[in-house]
Each structure stands twice: as C-alpha cells, then as structure tokens.
Amino acid sequence: MYGIFYAPEKLQIRRKDREKKKYLVSHTWIVKTPLPLISGQSYININKKTKKNSNIWEFRILPETSNTSLNTAMHTMVKNGQQTPVLLGSKIEPRDSTSIKSLVNEPNTPTDMYHPKIKTEYDMTIKKESPTSTEPLKETTKDTSKDTPKETLICKWSHCYREFQQAELLYHHLCQEHVGRKSQKNLQLKCQWDNCTSKTEKRDHMTSHLRVHVPLKPFACSTCSKRFKRPQDLKKHLKIHLSDLGIDAPKKKRGPKVGSKRVNSKSFHKVSYDQVPAIGSASQPRFNHYAPMQASQPVSYEHWVQMEMPHYTPVYSPALAERVQAISAPTLYVQGFENREPVVAATQFFTRLSTNMAYQVPNIQNQHLYVPNYVGRPDNLYLHSTAHSSDNSVKTSSSSSPIETSVPTTHHTDNKRSPLPAIHYVPQSNIPLVHSHVQPHYSANEVRPLPSLSSISMVTPKYVIDQNLPKYNRTYDTFSTNQKSCADEEEEIYDSDVSDDEISDMMNKVNLSDKNANEEEYDSDEEDFIATFKRVNILKDYAICTLLEEEYDTEDEPEPVLQPNVAESKSFDAHLMTFPEILI
C-alpha cells in the first residue's frame, strides 16, 4: 500500500538536540492507494551550522519513493483536491558513498497521480527517532480503539462549552455558575441546556431538573447496589425489597406538609427530645419495661423511632433484632415528624447498626459451627525428649483425690474456639537402648530412643497420676491391678440397679440427632441475622432519603438580599458570573 502524506512548506528550527541530531517529521496519511506515490520519511538536519530561522532539509529516499532527481527530493503538496509538485527541499550532499539512486526500485514511476477524494485539512506531529533508522514510515492514523480516554462531559448550556471529566464537577458547575443564587442576583430558573426550555419556580426544582441532563446517580441502594438520581427514586425502589421480605408497603397517602397546623396529633406521640440521652451514651437506660411486649406486638416506623429507639444502642443483639423485625414497612412520604431531630437520630442509629452488623457478616458461618464440648487428645503425637530427671518423672501422692470422671467443658467467647490444652510429653529415662561401651550422640532435631523397659514399672497403681498432665489428654496409658473382669457383660447389666428409662436417657444423650438439631438451630439463627441485616439496610436508606428530601425542601429558604438602587434596578440585567480563562 502506498499513500499521500502532508508536509509543511516551512518549518523553523528553534532548538538543538545534542544527543539526537535529527527529528522525524511524521506525516498524516491522507489517501491509501495501491499505486506508488510520493511517500517516505523526512529528517531535519540540525547538525550543520545554520543561520537563525533558516530551513535546511534532508530527505531520505525509500524504495517506495518515485522521485529520482539527483540529490533532490520532491514532495507532492496537495491542496483543495489538486496535485501540484512543489519543491520543498534544497540540494543535499550524501554523507556516505551510498547513492540515493541505488535506494530506488522503480525509477520510471510518474510523480503525480489524480485522486479525487482528498481531504483539505491536514495534521502534523513531530516525533523523535534514532538517525540510523531505515524503516519506512508507518501509518500515523489514530486508532480510537486503543488508549481511549475517559468520557469527556461537555456543558451544553447556552454559550458554554467547558469540558469536565466527572459528572459531579459538571453538576457543581451548573448549579453554581449557571443556576446561581438569589443572594448573588444571578438566579436562573429557566433551563438553557441545549434545546431544553423547562421553567421552574424554585431553585431546588431547577437543580433537581439538571440531573436529567447530567449522568449523575449519587444515591445507591445498600441491598442491590443500584444507583439513582434522586432520593425519591430510591425510596420508590425500596418497595421492591420490602416485598421480597414479605412486607407490603402501605399505600401512598398524602399527609400535611412539615410544619403545618393540620398535623393530626393522634398519628404520633409528642416527645421532648431534649430529655432523651444521645445514642450510645454511657448514661443511656435500657429498655427493659418494653421487653415483654416487644416479641409479638408490631409497631409503626414513626412510633418506634420516636418512642423506643432512644432506649437502644446501635449494636446487634437478639432482642434488638427481634424488635426490628416487628417494625412495619415505612411510608414513602414524610408524616408524623414535627422537626428534623428524630429523622437525624434515625439516620445515625441505623447507619451505625448497619456498620456493626456488616463486621459480623464474614463470621456468620464460623459463629454457628457445631463445636463439641469435649476436646479429645490428638491422634498424631510427635514425642520429643526433654531433660527430665527420674525423680521428677512420676510423682505419687497419698493425699491425692480420686480421678475426676467429668470432662471439663470449654467456654467459647467472641465466637472463637478455646485453645487446646498443653501437651505434656512422656518422661524419659537416662538409660539409652545402645551398647554400654558406645557413647551415643544425638542431634538437636533428632528423635531420641524410648527408655528401656526396665526403667518403667509395668504395673502402675490406680491413682498414681502426673500432676502436670491433664486427665483428659493423657499421652500414655496407665494400668491398675484392681481391674474388673468383662467376661459376663449381660449378667452385670441385669444385676445392676439401672432402670430401662435411665438407659434410654443415656442413649439419647449420645444420639446424633442432637447435633443435627443444633445445626438446624444455628442455620435458622443465620437466616434471621441476614433478614435483620437486610431490613436494617432498608430502614437506613429510607432514613437517609427522608433526610435529604428535607434538605432539598429547606434549600430554597429566603436568603438576605441586598436592596439595589432604584436607578440601577430598572437597568439591571441578571447575567451569569464568569471567570477569566488562563491560556498557557
């Protein structure tokens, strides 16, 4: 493939590079054609002594080049669809004995060809390249599929074309500079975005309308991670999760506006929140007098927030989870709140409770694992020898109490298993199993041989124990001379005083069904925890959206306005404030 490239008529030499003496002028390809046309690489030689603003060109003739003029190269300058050969270079002297003609494969190819489809605008980029490079010029057409930059957002407001990399910056630019404020005398309530002609009566309505033009979705659902432009949209989305939990959202019923005199006092209980202690405070009382009725009696969201929530701490507990499950679905509108304090308190409470429960989610499975109380001895014991004397190896005590048959239970705290008891090793005698004339040598990591049979008694008394060794984790067996015979097991069972009911009770204690019942109980607890966690997230999102809606309602409150003069007010024309642009 061949093609036409563009080169400027004049290129000023403004700096010198001492390491690399040449700059490659990378041309932009215009038309690709199978016919051989002018193509190649052009180098600017700055190694020679030149005057200021002088142009010295050196052209490297490549095999694709069709011009064969002696010591002269010619570019075809293309303008307005016409081909006119223009001499852009001067005569040059080859630096070596290699002739320029020897690099040409097709000496008789015409220099100008007619191509009707040619662009009229051209670009040129300058790139550094090694002077010894002999490769032909590659296509410099930009590939949009590689290294695609981030999507640039352009402000389409009237006579404004500023670019932004983030939707938040564009939205802030629209609200501050184009919509303005009443106190700054530049409030604009008519949308001028592209062809939009929407009009609003309040500033918060206009800022809410701008979210239609800006891809801004700051409100995310904690359950499914979907994002929305407005808190009202998120509150409507919460109805889906309420139905998934088996809760029917109440029908929308428009109530009196916040602060209205027509608020029904029977719909909520008036509480003085100045007397209620802060959430999480040390002096916060417990809600014990409500405990008997909380298990079954449902409660509305507004009543629970105002009456019961101040008596809880935002930490997960079974009692709090049971009461949260009894809260009915919140309404999708603000009703029953005279001030913002309960809304702010509910937002803080459910946010902290959700954070507290989120830390426990990874530990749910480990928390409800079935762990038996009895910890047996390990199967594989690696016995290491320690320097014990024969006097301290086994101790007898006449006043020692009988061996306890009860197995100590382990108490699990913080959802972690208690560590295993320490393992005590077999006492070793100093007599090795080697020849008496050979001195044994043992390395530090080598397992030493067991003591000889003559050093340990074969018959051990019944109550001789090692005081340092746990009874339920013995590393060796002990024997007694007072053992009972097990020849007639049936006679011993029938002769005993144990009844059939006691035997059945003993068998039920070792039945595996208890383990399955415990696992089912733990699974149900895990399901209850997850259901409570989802409900808490829904209540948290609802409280946040309610608070943001109130913020939007109070955003357009009357602001102090400077009274202008009468003469100036007649000729006053509200214009947008602009900032000077700095060109670098």
From Swiss-Prot:
GO terms for molecular function: DNA binding; zinc ion binding. InterPro entries: pacC/RIM101, Znf_C2H2_sf, Znf_C2H2_type. A zinc finger (C2H2-type) spans 153-178, 189-213, 219-241. Residues 385-422 are annotated as: Disordered. One of its GO terms (biological process) is positive regulation of transcription by RNA polymerase II. It is found in: Cytoplasm; Nucleus. Keywords: Activator, Cytoplasm, DNA-binding, Metal-binding, Nucleus, Repeat, Repressor, Transcription, Transcription regulation, Zinc, Zinc-finger. GO terms for cellular component: cytoplasm; nucleus. Residues 389-410 have a biased composition (Low complexity). Activated by C-terminal proteolytic cleavage by signaling protease (probably palB/RIM13) at neutral to alkaline ambient pH. Belongs to the pacC/RIM101 family. Transcription factor that mediates regulation of both acid- and alkaline-expressed genes in response to ambient pH. At alkaline ambient pH, activates transcription of alkaline-expressed genes (including RIM101 itself) and represses transcription of acid-expressed genes. This is pH-response transcription factor pacC/RIM101. It comes from Candida glabrata (strain ATCC 2001 / BCRC 20586 / JCM 3761 / NBRC 0622 / NRRL Y-65 / CBS 138) (Yeast).
